[in-house]
Curated annotation (Swiss-Prot):
Part of the 50S ribosomal subunit. NCBIfam families: rplD_bact. Residues 47-79 are annotated as: Disordered. GO terms for cellular component: ribonucleoprotein complex; ribosome. GO terms for biological process: translation. HAMAP family: Ribosomal_uL4_B. This is Large ribosomal subunit protein uL4. It comes from Hydrogenovibrio crunogenus (strain DSM 25203 / XCL-2) (Thiomicrospira crunogena). The gene is rplD. PANTHER family: 50S RIBOSOMAL PROTEIN L4 (PTHR10746), LARGE RIBOSOMAL SUBUNIT PROTEIN UL4M (PTHR10746:SF6). GO terms for molecular function: rRNA binding; structural constituent of ribosome. Keywords: Ribonucleoprotein, Ribosomal protein, RNA-binding, rRNA-binding.
């Protein structure tokens, strides 16, 4: 199948680029995309609970007082749950929220997302995407040339100038093919992909 190729300098169509039907023309599997996106979001969660039981609390090694003779109740440690400064009886622990996503599921979800982006004309293929200096206004100007505002730019490799130019924008981001994820793909209104990145995507998802 063919996708329109846009010349970044002019913002006009400059021909077409052949892409894999299996990757950019696959059927949309909503359930699979939902599962993979949720798995990525769950994996980003960090545990916030952390309490100690009686064995984890510092101290309490010495017997507080003699077993007999004082008239007080028997005590073997000062770090039991009923003591001030003691450990919790049933402490909360950090939970691992991560979910397993195997390669077949990941590739299937990515193909479904890219195919849906292509069908809805939210996937923009450009000849190249570079800035001469790390300036946000230069990056925004290039997006304006494409009549885009909310966009993720995918390049062949890490470009420091592009990264620095886009990091202060809440409505735009830059990543390379190696670091793309389904959450970013569904989170932006438009996805800009360079011609070189298309070939890398086809190799990665084949």
């Amino acid at each position: 199948m063919d996708l329109k190729l846009i010349e970044l300098a002019s913002g006009k169509e400059a021909g077409s680029v052949k892409v894999s039907e299996a990757i950019f023309g696959a059927e949309f599997n909503e359930a699979l995309v939902h599962q993979v996106v949720n798995a990525y979001l769950a994996g980003a969660r960090s545990g916030t609970k952390g309490q100690k039981n009686r064995s984890a609390v510092r101290g309490g090694g010495a017997k507080p007082w003699a077993q007999k003779g004082s008239g007080r109740a028997r005590a073997g440690t000062s770090r039991g749950p009923i003591w001030i400064g003691g450990g919790r009886a049933f402490p909360g622990h950090n939970r691992d929220f991560s979910q397993k996503v195997n390669k077949k599921m990941y590739r299937g979800a990515m193909k479904a997302i890219f195919s849906e982006l292509a069908r809805t004309e939210r996937l923009v293929v450009v000849d190249d995407f570079k800035v001469e200096a790390p300036k946000t206004k230069d990056f925004v100007a290039k997006l304006n040339t494409l009549n885009l505002k909310d966009a993720l730019v995918i390049t062949e490799g890490f470009d420091e100038y592009l990264y620095l130019s886009a990091r202060n924008l809440y409505h735009a981001d830059v990543c390379d093919v190696a670091s793309i994820d389904p959450v970013s793909l569904v989170g932006f209104k438009s996805i800009v992909v360079t011609q070189g990145a298309i070939k890398q995507l086809e190799e990665k998802l084949a």
